[in-house]
Amino acid sequence: LVTSPVPMNPSKIVCVHLNYSSRVEEFGARLPKAPTYFLKPPSALIRSGEPVVRPRGCRYLNFEGEIVAVIGSRCRGIEPEDAGRFVAGYTVGNDFGLHDFRDTDAGSMLRVKGSDTMCPVLEPVVSGWDFRGRGIRTLVNGEVRQSGNTDEMQWDPHYLIADISRTHTLLPGDLVFTGTPAGSRPVEPGDEVAVEVDGLGRLVNPVVAAEWGIPEGYGAQPSESEEVRSTALGGDWEYRGVRPPRPAAR
């Protein structure tokens, strides 16, 4: 195995929605026939040890521990069996989301998934790492909140990379987030969130409260609704105190 720095200036960060079977079951959702994706802006990137910032007025800041594929060379229109040749390596990521904006940003996910500090990534990249049969865990203050295995993935990283490349040219340094297992929940300022992946390492970030709030008087504001709660709180119906609806996945 060989390690190298993670490029912190990718042209794009592509994230898959549902991929792990436990996450699909948690939502009572149907697995789509093909992967669906959203983008995070590079400005959301932070390193291990740097704080994830929750704006004032927001309550539903969720973690999602993930494995991240780092593109090593330009690719377009490749086949899944060839995708490994275009991967520089893998690392650990945390696909944080501000679900308080889900009611207004459900289409683009811009503020939900792309706000500042919503994309912690571990350095370095590990090349020669085999993604099959690997454990992934997310811990909050030392307590395991997510625990899964890459064998749960419906589409492995090579499939995802090839699929994305059918319509988007992937460039060196681009990041592909490959999905999260069940157990994503909100965290609070003062919490410490760690993501561990067998053979890749441990990504750790503290959660802090922003000194600034979302300016009022214009633009969308953080909100709370059954849709927000159903996404942020997953299967915790008793905690939410509401009758479970049929939630939309992520």
Describe the residue ranges of each PLM region.
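Catalytic-pocket segment enriched in acidic/His residues
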Residues: 1-5, 23, 99-250
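Extended, compositionally biased flexible segments
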Residues: 1-59, 63, 228-230, 237-246
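Solvent-exposed alpha-helices and their adjacent loops that cap or buttress functional pockets
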Residues: 5-8, 29-31, 37, 44-45, ...
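Structural motif
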Residues: 11-14, 35-37, 43-44, 51, ...
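Short helix/loop capping segments that flank catalytic or ligand/cofactor-binding pockets
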Residues: 24, 48, 78-80, 100-102
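Short catalytic-site patches enriched in acidic/histidine residues
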Residues: 36-54, 76, 117-124, 182-185
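Short, conserved beta-strand element in jelly-roll/cupin
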Residues: 38, 68-73, 121, 161-162
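RNA pseudouridine synthases
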Residues: 64-94
